[in-house]
A protein has these predicted regions:
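Proline-rich, low-complexity linker regions of envelope-associated factors in Gram-negative bacteria
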Residues: 17-43, 47
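Active-site acidic/histidine clusters and adjacent loop/turn architecture
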Residues: 38-122
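C-terminal motif of bacterial Sec signal peptides marking the signal peptidase cleavage site
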Residues: 11-14
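Sec-dependent signal peptide recognition
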Residues: 1-7
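Acidic helix-start/capping segments at beta-turn-to-alpha-helix junctions
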Residues: 60-74, 119-132, 201-214
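Active-site-adjacent substructure of cysteine-protease-like catalytic cores
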Residues: 112-148
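Sequence contexts marking disulfide-bonded cysteines in secreted/extracellular proteins
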Residues: 16, 45-47, 68-70, 91-93, ...
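Catalytic cores and adjacent binding grooves of peptidoglycan-active enzymes
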Residues: 20-23, 58, 96, 108-110, ...
Length: 219
């Protein structure tokens, strides 16, 4: 009966529009369950957008992992035309924004400012059932990673062998490297609702946190 009630609540919530179909929280450590729900129009449109630009991806089953953590309307990116390490399941909206950023911002900026082609993007992952890091003295809050709605990008590998990392190069002595990183952050801020960099706090000293929300927060 509990499972039926949970699925009914989710189905009713899905009727409200959008794709924020996170299940009611279950205790942390609960056994993951697969949710058999209709795919909303917004998610189907997102899948179509990825297919339209030639992205290979696999839709993932909606799953509730307990403790407020879930993957709803998510995909596994397989081939975006550029190798990306560390990518796991992520909500389709953040995947779509990530693809646009990689293709239309990172690639041309590297060519223009660094004189070389990006051959790999390194990330620190996407989905992770955890709280926001760096909230000392404030109540715990689930991270965007807990719903697969965020990605952490750490470095870019160039064809000429250079590795441009957020940790080492954010305040690089090389003005072109600094300009490249600042430029791609500005572009990310136009595509993602939240972008956090080493300028935000110590918890982001080694990556750019990219989240598909409506916060309009860029640091």
């Amino acid at each position: 009966m509990k499972r039926i009630a949970l699925l009914l609540a989710l189905a009713l919530a899905a009727c409200g529009g959008g794709d924020d179909r996170r299940p009611p929280p279950r205790p942390a450590g609960s056994k993951p369950i697969t949710l058999n729900l209709p795919t909303p129009k917004e998610t189907r449109a997102c899948f179509a957008d990825l297919s339209r630009v030639g992205i290979r991806y696999s839709p993932l089953p909606d799953r509730d992992y307990g403790g407020g953590c879930s993957l709803i309307g998510s995909v596994q990116l397989i081939d975006i035309g550029l190798p990306v390490t560390g990518i796991k399941g992520m909500r389709c909206g953040v995947a779509r924004a990530f693809v646009g950023w990689a293709r239309n911002a990172i690639a041309p900026a590297a060519h223009q400012m660094l004189g070389s082609e990006v051959v790999r993007i390194e990330t620190m992952g996407t989905y992770a059932c955890r709280n926001v890091v760096g909230r000392s003295g404030r109540p715990a809050k689930l991270s965007g990673h807990a719903s697969g709605n965020a990605a952490d990008v750490s470095a870019f590998i160039l064809r000429d062998g250079r590795r441009i990392s957020i940790e080492r190069d954010w305040r690089s002595d090389d003005p072109q490297v600094r300009e490249f990183l600042q430029t791609i952050r500005k572009s990310a801020c136009k595509r993602f609702g939240t972008v956090l960099s080493p300028d935000y706090n110590a918890a982001h000293y080694n990556h750019l946190h990219l989240e598909d929300d409506r916060a309009n927060f860029c640091r």
